[in-house]
C-alpha cells in the first residue's frame, strides 16, 4: 500500500501540478472525501498561528489538529522546507501517523529524495515506508501530452469554446521546451494569447519559434547548421566566407 506516497524531483518538473491534479480528481470523482492540500510553508504558518494563540484561546491548537486529522487525503508540498522546523515536524508526524493508521492517504512532495533531506532519521524512514517515486524530466511524447492537457485546462477555465491550436504548433512548443513544466505551461498560455489576439488558427510554427525564442531557460541545445559552423570559423580565423568556400588556400585558410 503506497501510504505515504512520496514524490520527489528537481524544481519545475510538475510536482505541485501533480498534487493539484490528485486534489482535483478526488474532488470531482469522490466528492464525499475531504482533501487537504498545503504547501509546507502554509502548514508551518498554520502551526505557528495556532501555537501563538494557544495561551489566549485554548481551542486554537485543537482546531488546528482537527482540521488536518479530519482529512481523508492529505497532500503536503515541498516538505524539504520543514528542515530545521523540529516542532512543526513533530506535530506533522503526529497527524501523519494518525491518518495512515486510519487508512487515510498521505501524499508528500519534495525537491530531493528523503535521504537527502536534513531531518531526523526516523522521519526519513517514515517518508520511505510507502512508495517513493523520482520524477524525471519528461520525454518529447510526455511534453506533448502535457501541452494538450494545458490546452484542455485553459478551455475549461475560460469556457470560451475550443482552442484549435494546430498539431505542428503543439509539437513545436513541446520540442522547444526544456524540463521545466512551469515554463512549458506559460509557453502554452503565451501561444494561446497570441492566437486570441488575432492570429487565430493561422498561427504557424515560425510564429511560435519567434514568440518562444527566449522563453525557456533550460531548452534544448540549439542545433548547429553548416552556416553556423562556417560563421564561427570565419570569425575565429579572420577569413572571409568566400575564402572558406572558394578554391584559394592560403596558410590561414588551410589551418581553418
Pin down the residues of each PLM region.
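Terminal-proximal interaction/regulatory segments of ATP-powered molecular machines
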Residues: 243-256
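Conserved AAA+ ATPase "sensor/coupling" helix adjacent to the nucleotide-binding pocket
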Residues: 130, 144-158, 194
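C-terminal helical "lid" of AAA+/P-loop NTPase domains
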Residues: 168-175, 182-197
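Conserved AAA+ ATPase "SRH/arginine-finger" region at the nucleotide-binding site
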Residues: 118, 130-143
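Conserved catalytic/switch belt of AAA+ P-loop NTPases
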Residues: 84, 89-109, 121-126
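Short regulatory helix/loop adjacent to the ATP-binding pocket of P-loop NTPases
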Residues: 51-52, 114-129
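Walker A/P-loop nucleotide-binding motif
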Residues: 2-20
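Short glycine-rich substrate-engagement loop in P-loop NTPases that contacts/grips substrate
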Residues: 32-73, 86
Amino acid at each position: 500500500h503506497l501510504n505515504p506516497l512520496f514524490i520527489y524531483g528537481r524544481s519545475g518538473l510538475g510536482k505541485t501540478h501533480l498534487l493539484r491534479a490528485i486534489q482535483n480528481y478526488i474532488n470531482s470523482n469522490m466528492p464525499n472525501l475531504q482533501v487537504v492540500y498545503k504547501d509546507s510553508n502554509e502548514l508551518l504558518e498554520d502551526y505557528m498561528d495556532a501555537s501563538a494563540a494557544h495561551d489566549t484561546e485554548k481551542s486554537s491548537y485543537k482546531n488546528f489538529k482537527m482540521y488536518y486529522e479530519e482529512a481523508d487525503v492529505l497532500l503536503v508540498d515541498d516538505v524539504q522546507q520543514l528542515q530545521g522546523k523540529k516542532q512543526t515536524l513533530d506535530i506533522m508526524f503526529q497527524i501523519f501517523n494518525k491518518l495512515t493508521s486510519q487508512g487515510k492517504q498521505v501524499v508528500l512532495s519534495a525537491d530531493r529524495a528523503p535521504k537527502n533531506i536534513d531531518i531526523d532519521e526516523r522521519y526519513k524512514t517514515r517518508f520511505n515506508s510507502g512508495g517513493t517515486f523520482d520524477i524525471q524530466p519528461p520525454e518529447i511524447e510526455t511534453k506533448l501530452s502535457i501541452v494538450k492537457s494545458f490546452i484542455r485546462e485553459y478551455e475549461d477555465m475560460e469556457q470560451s469554446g475550443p482552442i484549435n491550436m494546430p498539431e505542428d504548433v503543439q509539437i513545436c512548443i513541446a520540442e522547444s521546451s526544456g524540463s521545466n513544466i512551469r515554463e512549458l505551461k506559460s509557453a502554452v498560455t503565451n501561444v494561446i494569447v497570441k492566437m486570441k489576439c488575432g492570429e487565430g488558427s493561422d498561427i504557424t510554427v515560425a510564429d511560435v519559434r519567434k514568440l518562444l525564442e527566449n522563453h525557456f531557460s533550460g531548452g534544448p541545445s540549439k542545433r548547429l547548421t553548416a552556416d553556423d559552423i562556417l560563421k564561427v570559423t570565419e570569425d575565429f580565423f579572420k577569413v572571409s566566407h568566400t575564402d572558406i568556400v572558394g578554391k584559394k588556400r592560403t596558410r590561414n585558410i588551410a589551418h581553418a
